[in-house]
């Protein structure tokens, strides 16, 4: 028994080449037509005999050329038919083989979720879908799909007895201010023979788009898959790049890459190399002519940033998307602290030199009220219920403002000497005040907070 390997496309190419030969023969035959009837050079017998001789040779060439052209046409036809026949035979032989393979894989796929022979499917990018496992006997694992923003990459599929593990999918980029998602783990190589899949790259950290807020950490690279008894472990995925920080915020460093996969057996190759950590995010700096001794800063629920300028008695408004100043609000004298109500969204600014608190409507960015408080109004904070607390630096007191009427309620609360900073616990509502001259912190409790105790620091 003998076997013949034929590539139909090569046969088709040979037929095309033979057709070009036939074209050349026809061209030569046409050129020789002029020699079949040669006129005698003179009217004598010798000239007539010579002309007859050349004409006879031309006629013989034409006859032979016609036969060659006919043979060539039949040869080209035979080659073309052979190419089609081989292609049909090849397709016919492939279909039964695929049918046999499908019949073998169907029950195994149904019972175990993976074929006996064949590669696993790749996960869909943008979904974090895991790659399919390769065939139990033979086949490579599918690659994991990349993650959507904030979603980890899919794990690579494992190989069976023989085959390579699939690569882990890349982690999705972090949402604003949040860490990038982790890369997917690489799939294990075949138990007997095969390399582990590489871990997926960690996602980049989310950008810190708001003034003073850092970007997210880069995502951790995926762990490389284990190699088979004979095979090399997959490389760990690279760590994601740290997210870019918001204006005047610290950058975030990238996270280290995933560990490389080790060998499963004593003969296995070396484990993969862990990925490098991502680069730190950049710091954005905003400059503007309206800035004059900027002092306090706060962010409202819509993301707009408010900066007090003590030297120009104004409040600058910054767009968080573009990090540019979009407005300047004329305020009281010596604006210092600024806070935003979590209930109403109103912005409260302390004016150190005029002993007042300005109320700013964030919808129009205009001052809608001025509330008299103690001497040297400096710090300001708002509790979860909406009450506003203002430190009066020269009065050594804290004023409490009712959000319903925007007026001071009750008597000022005595605290330590030279109160400056003030903050509210968002869970308990307890107010903390720093006193710079006696080195203490006053703790104010109650609703609204009234009871005071001081602790030395």
Curated annotation (Swiss-Prot):
Keywords of the record: Cell wall, Repeat, Secreted, Virulence
UniProt superkingdom: Bacteria
Consequences of knocking out this gene: Invasion of the infant human brain microvascular endothelial-cell monolayer is significantly decreased in transposon mutant.
Cell location: Secreted, Cell wall
Keyword Zinc: no
InterPro entries in the cross-refs: Host-pathogen_enzymatic-act (IPR051200), N2O_reductase_N (IPR011045), NHL_repeat (IPR001258), PE-PGRS_N (IPR000084), PGRS_rpt (IPR048996), WD40/YVTN_repeat-like_dom_sf (IPR015943), YVTN_b-propeller_repeat (IPR011964)
Residue span(s) of domain PE: 1-92
Up-regulation conditions: Highly up-regulated during the early stages of invasion of the human blood-brain barrier.
GO CC annotation terms, alphabetical: extracellular region
Each NHL repeat, start to end: 291-321, 333-363, 379-404, 419-447
SUPFAM superfamilies per record: Nitrous oxide reductase, N-terminal domain, PE/PPE dimer-like
Main location: secreted
Gene3D superfamilies: HP0062-like domain (1.10.287.850), YVTN repeat-like/Quinoprotein amine dehydrogenase (2.130.10.10)
Protein function: Enhances mycobacterial intracellular survival, probably via altering host macrophage cytokine profiling and attenuating the cell apoptosis. Could be required for host endothelial-cell invasion.
UniProt family annotation: Belongs to the mycobacterial PE family. PGRS subfamily.
Official protein name in the record: PE-PGRS family protein PE_PGRS18
Species assigned in the record: Mycobacterium tuberculosis (strain ATCC 25618 / H37Rv)
Higher taxonomy: Bacteria, Bacillati, Actinomycetota, Actinomycetes, Mycobacteriales
Gene that this polypeptide is encoded by: PE_PGRS18
């Amino acid at each position: 028994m003998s076997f013949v390997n034929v590539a139909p496309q090569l046969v088709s190419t040979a037929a095309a080449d033979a057709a070009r030969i036939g074209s050349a023969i026809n061209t030569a035959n046409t050129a020789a037509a002029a020699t079949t009837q040669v006129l005698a050079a003179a009217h004598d017998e010798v000239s007539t005999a010579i002309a007859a001789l050349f004409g006879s040779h031309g006629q013989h060439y034409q006859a032979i050329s016609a036969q060659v052209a006919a043979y060539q046409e039949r040869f080209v036809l035979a080659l073309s038919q052979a190419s089609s026949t081989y292609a049909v035979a090849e397709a016919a032989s492939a279909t039964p083989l695929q049918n046999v393979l499908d019949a073998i894989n169907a029950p195994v796929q149904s019972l175990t979720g993976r074929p006996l022979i064949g590669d696993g499917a790749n996960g869909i990018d943008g979904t974090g879908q895991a790659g399919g496992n390769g065939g139990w006997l033979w086949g490579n694992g599918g690659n994991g799909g990349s993650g959507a923003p904030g979603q980890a990459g899919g794990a690579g599929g494992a190989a069976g007895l023989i085959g390579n593990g699939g690569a882990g999918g890349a982690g999705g980029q972090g949402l604003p201010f949040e860490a990038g998602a982790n890369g997917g783990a690489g799939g294990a190589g075949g138990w007997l023979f095969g390399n582990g899949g590489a871990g997926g790259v960690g996602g980049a950290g989310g950008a810190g788009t708001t003034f003073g807020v850092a970007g997210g950490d880069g995502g951790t690279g995926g762990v490389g898959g284990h190699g088979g008894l004979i095979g090399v472990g997959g490389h760990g995925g690279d760590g994601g790049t740290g997210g870019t920080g918001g204006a005047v915020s610290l950058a975030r460093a990238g996270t280290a890459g995933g560990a490389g996969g080790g060998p499963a057996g004593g003969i296995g190759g070396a484990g993969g190399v862990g990925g490098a950590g991502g680069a730190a995010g950049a710091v954005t700096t905003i400059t503007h002519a309206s800035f004059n001794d900027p002092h306090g800063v706060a962010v409202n629920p819509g993301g707009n940033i408010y900066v007090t300028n003590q030297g120009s008695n104004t409040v600058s408004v910054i767009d968080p998307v573009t990090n540019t100043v979009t407005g300047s609000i004329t305020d009281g004298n010596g604006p210092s602290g600024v806070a935003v109500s979590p209930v109403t969204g109103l912005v409260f600014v302390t004016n150190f030199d005029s002993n007042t608190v300005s109320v700013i409507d964030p919808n129009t960015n205009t001052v809608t009220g001025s509330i008299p408080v103690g001497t040297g109004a400096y710090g300001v904070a708002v509790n979860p219920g909406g009450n506003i607390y203002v430190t009066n630096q020269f009065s050594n007191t804290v004023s409490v403002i009712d959000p319903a009427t925007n007026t001071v309620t009750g008597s000022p609360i005595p605290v330590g000497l030279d109160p400056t900073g003030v903050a509210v616990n968002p869970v308990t509502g307890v107010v903390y005040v720093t006193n710079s001259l006696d080195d203490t912190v006053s703790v104010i409790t109650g609703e609204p907070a009234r009871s005071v105790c001081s602790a030395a620091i």
